[in-house]
Amino acid sequence: MAFVGSRIWSGFPEPRFICGKNRVSPGQMDPELFFFSGCTLRCVYCQNYHIANSEVGKTVSVERLSEIFLELQEQGANNINLVTPTHFVPQIIAALDQARKKGLNLPIVYNTSGYEKVETLRRLNGYVDVYLPDFKYLDPEHAKKYSGAEDYPEVAKAALEEMVRQTGNPVFNDAGIMTKWCNCETFVIAWVSERCERIVKYLYETYGDQIYMSLMNQYTPLDNV
């Protein structure tokens, strides 16, 4: 399948993406992943460097993106997982509007770095069923050093609060599959491992059982990282 990326065309920017599969939670079938090229952060340990830091891929129109959503539903996809979609929110909303008019009813997963403006998330209210934000830092110095975003902790805290407000407590369907919830992901990196303990403590003390947490341990040193 094609990429949805960051090249700006006349009139309306057209996204580009790469499709894949990944398991969102126990009990769920594999969703379709849409990796949008480009990223709002510049993490020195990025595991998707070739996607986040380039215009790799094939551009598609909003109309074509809406058609792809519908095609995936017809093929039996369980949900649609949008990865690093922040800089294409207007186009995604337009594509979802078009697809819903034609019968799209799959849950939408918003898979993000957590570096989100609250006003952007509010535009997504009613469109997103599942939020999968990273929560990378509580220390501004770490955020600046490793991701170039000193304000990440405060931005991510406010963003997560809005995500939880929208999703509420986890919702399960009759098959025991979660259809509405918020899951925070924290990347485990050896040289700043103490940050994970602080983050887990903060998330639990703040949200308790309202959210799920995932500790990601797949860090691999890569070229250009």
Model-derived features with residue positions:
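Conserved glycine-rich "GG(E/T)P / GGGxP" loop and the immediately following alpha-helix
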Residues: 73-98, 145, 151, 161, ...
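Soluble or luminal CAZymes and related metallo-dependent hydrolases
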Residues: 61-64, 155, 191-195
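Auxiliary Fe-S-binding modules of radical SAM enzymes
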Residues: 1, 168-225
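Conserved Radical SAM active-site core
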Residues: 3-126, 130, 140
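Conserved radical SAM core fold
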Residues: 52, 89, 114-117, 135-153, ...
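Structural preference for beta-strand elements that scaffold enzyme active sites
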Residues: 79-81, 107-109, 130-132, 179-183, ...
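Anionic-ligand binding region
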Residues: 144-174
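Non-cysteine beta-strand/loop elements that form the S-adenosyl-L-methionine
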Residues: 125-140, 212-218
